[in-house]
Amino acid sequence: MMTVCAEQHVNFIHSDAASLLNDIEQRLDQLLPVESERDLVGAAMRDGALAPGKRIRPLLLLLAARDLGCNATPAGLLDLACAVEMVHAASLILDDMPCMDDAQLRRGRPTIHCQYGEHVAILAAVALLSKAFGVVAAAEGLTATARADAVAELSHAVGMQGLVQGQFKDLSEGDKPRSADAILMTNHYKTSTLFCASMQMASIVAEASGEAREQLHRFSLNLGQAFQLLDDLTDGMADTGKDAHQDEGKSTLVNLLGPQAVETRLRDHLRCASEHLLSACQDGYATHHFVQAWFEKKLAAVS
């Protein structure tokens, strides 16, 4: 049973995260203006990035940076977080396209290509990626070296060692029989790499030690796997904001091993993630408490 002190601490973390979430959404609103009523690409960019979402990656970037003792100006750090969310939004727009996952619903709304057409959706995704890198390159309060390193981390997460590779593997192998290891590798590219970039960007700005950066890398790898396993477990549930049963006929760990075994694996990944996170952030625990509370709430809904 949670003590009064612990409950108050968790409530504070939730309140803090809500405040950061508001900051992220306000800044995204500023960074993604629509020039005119005819600016369909701009409107699609805004809808893709500002549709109601979890904002887990930018929240973790901000929380981890603070736990690491980051002294960068709030504006510069916030811009890095928003850039991560733009990359994530761009990847979702592309994932949902008819030639890929052919999804009709995302974040409780019609997908971008359903609203604006495929041509606008593709252009909006490319423009979001371009905007994200520009925002990082111009982030206030960071040294030129820090900005360049942050751009490199984000670039790595997008390309053939990240989101692009993950989506290609999912499209080319997802409907074929696969081993658990092959599925985990796809999950790594699809999900873990952007978490890794988020944590490494926080580390860069906070000037964290090499050991802390390595621990955060390991945290991100495990967190990404846990996140993807949770996504697989909730496929078919009505309140995810996405098309139900998207994984039918796909070789996921849930289909291979069953929900109970996957939940056990998920909790193992969370435990490992927690150990690495606490090793990296020894003077701040906001990130740890946020991750634990978020997953426990989600797991309670599927148990």
Give names to the regions the model predicted:
Residues E37-L299:
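Mg2+-dependent prenyl diphosphate-binding active-site environment of isoprenoid biosynthetic enzymes
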